[in-house]
Every structure is written in C-alpha cells, then in structure tokens.
From Swiss-Prot:
One of its GO terms (cellular component) is oligosaccharyltransferase complex. Keywords: Endoplasmic reticulum, Membrane, Signal, Transmembrane, Transmembrane helix, Virulence. Belongs to the SWP1 family. This is Dolichyl-diphosphooligosaccharide--protein glycosyltransferase subunit delta. Pfam families: Ribophorin_II_C (PF25147). The keyword Transmembrane helix applies. It is found in: Endoplasmic reticulum membrane. The chain crosses the membrane at residues 179-199, 214-234, 241-261. Induction: Expression is down-regulated during biofilm formation. Disruption phenotype: Leads to sensitivity to both cell wall-damaging agents calcofluor white and Congo red, as well as to thermosensitivity. Causes significantly more damage to the host macrophages.
Length: 275
C-alpha cells in the first residue's frame, strides 16, 4: 500500500514543472493567508485549535482549463513526510476548492508538532505542472489532546518488569487462636473439676499432706506447663509469629507430657489406695 502511494507521488513529481500563477487563499476560522502569483520560499502558518475547525482552500490558476489528469492536496508531517493523508479537491474551470475538517485528520497526524499542506497538479498534455507547499498547519496542544492515537510497541529493549510478590500471612484468622484459648481454658477447668469430683473438695487439700515433695513439684510443674500453653496462645492472638508459637508449643509439650504422666500415675495410685 505504501509502495503504491510512493510510486504515485513519484510520477507526479516527474510531471510537475510550473503552474506558478496559483493564487487564492487558505483559511481556518477567522485566520486567513493569501497566495500570490509569485511562488516564494516563504511558507506561512495557520493553527488548528479545535476538532470543529475547517481548513478552507480556495485557489485559482489561469493555466487550468478544467480538471487536470492528476490533482491532489496532501497533509503530511514536516519531519516525516511519509506520514501523510491525501485529498482530491473540486476543480471547476480555473477554480480549485477543498474543505478539510479537522475532525477527519488521521489520529497520528493530530499528534505532530507541524504539518505541511501541499498541492500537486500534473497533466500529460500540459507543460505547466506544479508541486507547491501552500501552508504549514500547527496543531495546538488542545487539539493534540483530542487524538486517540497510541503508538504500537516496537521490537527492542522493553521496560523492566517489576512484580511484588505477596508475602505469606504472618498470622491465621483471629478466630483460630480464640477457639484454642477457649478450648485450653475449658480443659483446665475440666481438670480442676475432675480433681474435685474424684477427690472431693474436702480431701483435695488434704492430699498435699499425703503426697511426697517430689510429686508435689511434679503437680505444680504440670500446672505451670498448662498455663504456659495458655500464655503462648494469648501471645499468638496478640500478634506473635506462627513459627514462634509452634516453637514455644514444642518446648512446653515436653514438660507438659512428662509431668502430666507423673500426675496421672499419682492420681491412679492414690485412688487405688482409697486416698
């Protein structure tokens, strides 16, 4: 597609020679420039401020006697002429007219800093052919902001990808430690209740006189171990790490099992003796 456009433009360039008597005006809103018969190097400028603007081209050439074989108006980027769009004006006798709505300009051209409007006239039966830069069109920042153009990514170095991995949860749902705390307190109360049920409230404190000091130490150590478990779960509920909680739980389980077995054996022995 691009190749065919370049070939057509090249053919027009080969044919284009003169048409120096081109006169008329180009207007955008209330701003207007005029073209004289002399083709000077100076190219005037007009500004597009809104998508509602219209580029009005009204030209006249004495050498044109009807529509030429080839006539085209192009709007292209000054820095990169390959980015362009083309229009066919209306030719009636020696008059050339064309209205270009700013809204119809390609999105990519709306983003450019400076555009150039050029007319090409060529006819194989005439020696007076022409290529002429008519005016430079400057898209305003407000007009640029209306463009929906997005540049396509090119092959090459791409921006570095940054990804923040989500950290593991430091604690579980608060309801879990609450359930463990309630269960631990329930078991502790059940332990005391079983002692009262088996031994009786009157004989509970009397057993301190019948058991040895070593067994009393084991009983107290067992109670301290159970309270340690309670404290460990409370600290976990207040924000202690799960790994720290498991570590302390493992440490407390050793004396708890050891002294718990001793307490149960002592209770079984005393019950067998009827104490």
């Amino acid at each position: 597609m691009k190749t065919s456009v370049f070939i057509a433009i090249f053919n027009l360039l080969v044919c284009a020679l003169a048409y120096t008597d081109l006169t008329g005006s180009i207007k955008i809103n209330d701003k207007k420039i005029t073209l004289g018969e002399f083709n000077t190097q100076e190219v005037k400028q007009l500004t597009i401020n809104s998508p509602k603007d219209i580029i009005e081209i009204d030209l006249k050439s004495k050498d044109i006697k009807g529509k030429p074989e080839q006539i085209m108006v192009s709007l292209a980027d000054v820095k990169n002429p390959a980015i362009s769009t083309h229009y066919v004006p209306v030719v009636k006798e020696s008059k050339i007219k064309l209205n270009i709505k700013a809204l119809s300009i390609p999105e990519v051209l709306k983003t450019k800093d400076k555009l150039v409007l050029t007319i090409v006239i060529a006819d194989s039966k005439s020696k007076n052919n022409m290529i002429r830069r008519l005016v430079e069109v400057l898209p305003s920042p407000e007009f640029k902001s209306t463009s929906r153009y997005q540049a396509k990514p090119r092959i090459g170095i791409q921006p570095e990808i940054h990804h923040i991995f989500r950290e593991d949860e430091r604690t579980v749902n608060p309801i879990v430690p609450v359930v463990f705390i309630i269960a631990a307190f329930t078991l502790l109360l059940g332990l005391f209740g079983s002692w009262v049920g088996f031994i009786g409230i009157d004989n509970l404190f009397r057993t301190f006189k019948t058991i040895s000091k070593v067994q009393l130490l084991h009983n107290v150590s067992f109670l301290i171990s159970v309270l340690g478990f309670e404290l460990n779960f409370v600290k976990y509920y207040l924000g202690q790490s799960i790994f720290t909680t498991l570590f302390y739980g493992f440490i407390l389980s050793i004396p708890c099992v050891y002294f718990g077995v001793s307490v149960l054996r002592s209770l079984a022995k005393n019950r067998a003796l009827g104490k």
